[in-house]
């Protein structure tokens, strides 16, 4: 893996490869609670 700074590594940093940082996923335990939290988060982020 060429990081562009002259250092080669066999593994990626904890953030992963920047080209793939476009999608995020979340897993919840309960259906209704997860829907409520998703709605709350979408309203509060605006």
From Swiss-Prot:
Family per record: Belongs to the class-I pyridoxal-phosphate-dependent aminotransferase family.
Role, per record: Important for the metabolism of amino acids and Krebs-cycle related organic acids. In plants, it is involved in nitrogen metabolism and in aspects of carbon and energy metabolism.
EC number, UniProt record: 2.6.1.1
Subunit structure: Homodimer.
Catalytic activity field: L-aspartate + 2-oxoglutarate = oxaloacetate + L-glutamate
Name of this protein: Aspartate aminotransferase 1
Cofactor: pyridoxal 5'-phosphate
Species of the source: Pseudotsuga menziesii (Douglas-fir)
Additional facts recorded: In eukaryotes there are cytoplasmic, mitochondrial and chloroplastic isozymes.
GO molecular function, a single term: L-aspartate:2-oxoglutarate aminotransferase activity
